[in-house]
Amino acid sequence: MFYTENYDVIVIGGGHAGTEAALATARMKLKTLLLTHNIDTLGQMSCNPAIGGIGKGHLVKEIDAMGGLMATAADKAGIQFRTLNSSKGPAVRATRAQADRVLYRQVVRIALENQPNLDIFQQEVTDIILEKDSIAGVETKMGLKFRAKSVVLTAGTFLAGKIHIGLENYAGGRAGDPASVNLAKKLRDLNLRVNRLKTGTPPRIDARTINFDILAKQYGDEKLPVFSFMGSVEQHPEQIPCYITHTNDQTHDVIRKNLDRSPMYTGVIEGIGPRYCPSIEDKVIRFSDRNSHQIYLEPEGLTSNEVYPNGISTSLPFDVQMKIVNSMKGLEKARIVKPGYAIEYDYFDPRDLKPTLETKAISGLFFAGQINGTTGYEEAAAQGLLAGINAGLFVQEKESWFPRRDQAYIGVLVDDLCTVGTKEPYRVFTSRAEYRLLLREDNADIRLTSIARELGLIDDIRWARFNQKMENIELERQRLRSIWLHPRSEYLNEANEILKSPLVREVNGEDLLRRPEINYQILTALTPFKPAMEDKEAVEQVEIAIKYQGYIEHQQEEIERQKRHENTAIPANFDYKNISGLSNEVCAKLEQYRPISIGQASRISGITPAAISILLVNLKKQGMLKRGE
């Protein structure tokens, strides 16, 4: 039965990827339908109640710079904010927020329900409708069929999801939600490579049964950060502390004695888990020399008694989970309200995707989130945004867009996935980016907001504020460059009091700011450089741009060298087998990965610089050497 209404874009799934995808296409003024199995779980934080962190915070800022929701939701739901690596350079500083699950979900739902051009419908999707090799719509469990020109699939851990607690297991998408079994079967019939991954979550503990008095407190920063470039500290709810406990020899003994009841160590679970978020079983076995692991007790909200013990993700049986919890300081009498579990689920090899996140096999079908082999809310949201943008551009028959590696962490993420693929849950780190100094949290808007405006993602209010900031940066730099101090200046003594070495030549404000002992606040306290600018975001950009100018210019020169052939396109039907000089191994890899550009080909493991040179020569010979923009 076809539903009478047709859509431009249909988004399947209401998690972090799905919500960003749906909001993006709706902001592009396209008629969008978001299908979810449960409207009440839109924006659900299924695992840890936190947003951001190293690399992840950078993604959140980039999503916000392009008009996405995640940063605003975190600002309005964050109950503890911290700036990680605050003593280090600006490239690796990262914002993290402990979030109230209920508040976060409320912010997401309000945004979705008030977004023009967006309809929400509660129904499980059981099939996709194809016409030849193109998407045409979807079918739901009750037989409703919705037509659309493009579809974004963001099924999370629901595709053939299987939950494990001890040696018992059952079908489920997450605790309390059914798995998407029929859709998983249908998708396995497509020309896409499918495999299994695993993730896990710890038991939740009743706060009323924890002895907080004997535990160390961890407070957020006194100077509270914000995620959104449009956000303010006033948006934050009440701030509360987390607490710290530790595993001990007793904890580890309990785990070792019960490994024969672990689905991971008895071969029941075959999917590979996240390397950077291992289960407590894994930590005890892999780091056998350690007799203790730090565990953070994170409140799940201002109105909830549930506490998330970050660091003891487990799939051991419930009775063992109780012993693990009760073995730790402050938790001797603690009660579990939700057991921990592991979940196995289907994911698709992301090498079968274009960098736009459109599947190579089916025109108009886009994948985003954990089904592409990633882990984390932020990685999912970033993919959802990108998939939504490109689904919208596809419908409008416009040229697709995706960021370069030197342009955004979103670009690093999709390039890693689509070029190299992954066999374990992938997460973003700053160490994955070659040009970290250019991809800072603080300049995400400078990198991406103009592009987002062209794509139709940015409203007039945000655009005006962004332009005002850019103008403030330029005016302040001009002002500092125009003010000079010389050895005969009447302000010389005032300046020399704060300088490590006295002035012996004429300098301007930018020259002074480059000195390590001078920051913007100190500089603008000097009489000739008063008054300081009030726009704190612009001040930060001025100071970083001046202090790191040499390093930034060096990275930009390196990027220009790399870009010479980065975007040189390789035709989709290019015949590698007829190129003399390429080894069989190189040919096989190029045939398997089907890179869309020379840059992407160069990042495939085993593809040598010599092979790239041969490719370029042959592209030129065949008249195909067209450099992308």
Curated annotation (Swiss-Prot):
Q: Where in the cell is it found?
A: Cytoplasm
Going by the UniProt record, its keywords in alphabetical order are: Cytoplasm, FAD, Flavoprotein, NAD, tRNA processing
Query: Which GO CC terms are listed, alphabetically?
Result: cytosol
What are the BP-aspect GO terms? tRNA methylation; tRNA wobble uridine modification
Recorded hits in InterPro entries, A to Z, give: FAD/NAD-bd_sf, GIDA_C_N, MnmG, MnmG-rel, MnmG-rel_CS, MnmG_C, MnmG_C_subdom, MnmG_C_subdom_sf
Which SUPFAM superfamilies does its entry note? Answer: FAD/NAD(P)-binding domain (SSF51905)
Q: What NCBIfam families does this protein map onto?
A: mnmG_gidA
Query: Which purpose does this protein serve, as stated in its record?
Result: NAD-binding protein involved in the addition of a carboxymethylaminomethyl (cmnm) group at the wobble position (U34) of certain tRNAs, forming tRNA-cmnm(5)s(2)U34.
> Subunit structure, briefly?
Homodimer. Heterotetramer of two MnmE and two MnmG subunits.
The protein in question is named tRNA uridine 5-carboxymethylaminomethyl modification enzyme MnmG
Species of the source = Histophilus somni (strain 2336)
- State the gene name recorded for this protein: mnmG
